[in-house]
Structure formats: structure tokens, C-alpha cells
């Protein structure tokens, strides 16, 4: 039986009275943006099997940062009334008024504009795909009003980091959209999606009863006590696909070691989740992707 302290953890909460900068950083969950970066770079490195040009790496970071800022702000804005009713999320800055609705809308508009500008400077294919990528990101908070597959929608956003990193570099070498799509390291894209379903469920399981009362959908609500094993199954599939990616894309021993560590850290996160410590489980699960991303990058770079 899971023992969950539902009021103890919220990655987007800001209970302390600190500077406006601190409040913005908590609001945007800025650390998660940096944790996503290695997976975007993994996509870029695996796609061309060499170190990408530094300007492109900088543009990948900027694009990821601006789009994630827009997406996270939109998520908070769309859910502000729901968050106000949830004991776990009622300290979020948009709920408490530390950040205003007007500020949030301004952040979204500026961030989306800067994302499209960054994508334009990456390459033609990145730019023409940018509206579709933005649509996937910005529509997420509304999906959970309708379907449990919102967990996979969120996970697909994480997979888009790998996809977008690959497009950013492949567009430098190919003039055909088909060639760019063929060069995407799809095994790692799909592995990332299954990995992300697990950590998203760690976020939703503590809120399952509340979400059910609000008419919100997730696999945590749909599956009840079976949601945690379902999260573990998704992550097992993720590890298998990551190993297949190592093999299919002819990566070396460092990548394989990183994949083993990736799986072991996820296993520990699953253990923590079984103990009801979803806060630590959530972050250890993110750490596992950082290990995988950095390991694959080092493997190719050396």
C-alpha cells in the first residue's frame, strides 16, 4: 500500500518569500529545462555521429528554453483555477498572485516569438516544423480534460526534444524533408516518450483522487493502484528501446554503460515511488535521462 504525503511536494510551488527572480524560476521549474537539454543534444549528436557546430548547439538551447518557458507558463495559466483547489499546488505563483495573469500572458507571447525566431536561425526545416512543435506543447494542458492519453501527450513533448535536436543538425546537410525525417534517431525519440510517461505518472499518482473529483483524466485516474506498475512497464520498454538505439546507431561502450546506469537510476526511482516518495522519484527519473544523454554525447564526442 502506498503512503503518499499529498501536500509535501510540488516542483512548481514557491512557498518562501524570496526575490522575484526566485519566484520566476520556481514558476518555470527552470531546472527541468536544463535536465531536458542533454536529450535534445543526444538527438543532434546521434543524427550526425559527430559534434554539431557550436552555433547550432546554442540555438538548440535557446529554442528549447523559449518553447519550454511558453509551454510551462501556458500550463500554469490553463490550470490556475484547478491548482488553487489542490492542496499540493496551491502555492504556485500564479495561484498566490506572486505572478499575475497579465505577466503570464506576456511571458507566453514573448517566449513563443523568440522560439520562432530561434527556429528560423536554425534551418529551414526547423522553422517550418516549429508551429507544429509549438502546437503540441501548448495544447497539452487541455488534453487532460478529455483523455488519459494526456500522459503520452506530455511524454511526446519530451520526445520532441530528441526529434528537434536531430532536425536542427540534419537540416544543415540535407535538402530533402524525407532525408531529414529518415535521419531522425527514432528509437531514442520513442524511448524518451516511454521514459517520460513514467515520470509524468509520478506527478499524477499523488493527485489521482483530486483529479478524479475534478473530472480530469490520466492513467493514474484510469488505472488506480495499477498505475505505478504501468509506469514501471513504460520505463522498462524505454530502457529496452535505448539499448536497441545503442546497437542500431552503432554507439560505443560509453553509451551502453550510460544506458545501464539510466536503467538502474530509473529502477531506484521506481523503488522510491513504491515507498510513496514521489518527489524524489520524479527527480531521480529526470537524473536518469541526464546520465543517458550525457553518456551518449560523450561516446560520440570522443
Where are these regions (language model features)?
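Multi-pass alpha-helical membrane architecture of UbiA-family
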Residues: 2-302
Amino acid at each position: 500500500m502506498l503512503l503518499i504525503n499529498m501536500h509535501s511536494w510540488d516542483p512548481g510551488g514557491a512557498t518562501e518569500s524570496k526575490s522575484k527572480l526566485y519566484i520566476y524560476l520556481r514558476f518555470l521549474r527552470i531546472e527541468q529545462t536544463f535536465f531536458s537539454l542533454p536529450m535534445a543534444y543526444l538527438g543532434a549528436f546521434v543524427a550526425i555521429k559527430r559534434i554539431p557546430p557550436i552555433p547550432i548547439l546554442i540555438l538548440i538551447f535557446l529554442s528549447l528554453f523559449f518553447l519550454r518557458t511558453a509551454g510551462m507558463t501556458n500550463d500554469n495559466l490553463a490550470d490556475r483555477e484547478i491548482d488553487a483547489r489542490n492542496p499540493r499546488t496551491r502555492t504556485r505563483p500564479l495561484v498566490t498572485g506572486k505572478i499575475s495573469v497579465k505577466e503570464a500572458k506576456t511571458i507566453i507571447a514573448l517566449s513563443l516569438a523568440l522560439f520562432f525566431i530561434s527556429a528560423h536561425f536554425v534551418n529551414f526545416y526547423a522553422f517550418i516544423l516549429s508551429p507544429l512543435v509549438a502546437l503540441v506543447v501548448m495544447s497539452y494542458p487541455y488534453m487532460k480534460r478529455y483523455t488519459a492519453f494526456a500522459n503520452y501527450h506530455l511524454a511526446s513533448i519530451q520526445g520532441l526534444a530528441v526529434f528537434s535536436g536531430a532536425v536542427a543538425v540534419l537540416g544543415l546537410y540535407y535538402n530533402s524533408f524525407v532525408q531529414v525525417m529518415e535521419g531522425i534517431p527514432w528509437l531514442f525519440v520513442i524511448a524518451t516518450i516511454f521514459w517520460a510517461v513514467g515520470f509524468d505518472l509520478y506527478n499524477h499518482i499523488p493527485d489521482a483522487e483530486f483529479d478524479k473529483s475534478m473530472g480530469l483524466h490520466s492513467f493514474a485516474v484510469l488505472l488506480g493502484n495499477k498505475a505505478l506498475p504501468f509506469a514501471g512497464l513504460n520505463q522498462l520498454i524505454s530502457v529496452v528501446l535505448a539499448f536497441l538505439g545503442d546497437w542500431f546507431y552503432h554507439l560505443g561502450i560509453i553509451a551502453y554503460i550510460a544506458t545501464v546506469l539510466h536503467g538502474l537510476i530509473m529502477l531506484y526511482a521506481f523503488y522510491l515511488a513504491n515507498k510513496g516518495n514521489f518527489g524524489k522519484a520524479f527527480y531521480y527519473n529526470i537524473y536518469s535521462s541526464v546520465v543517458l544523454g550525457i553518456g551518449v554525447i560523450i561516446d560520440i564526442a570522443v
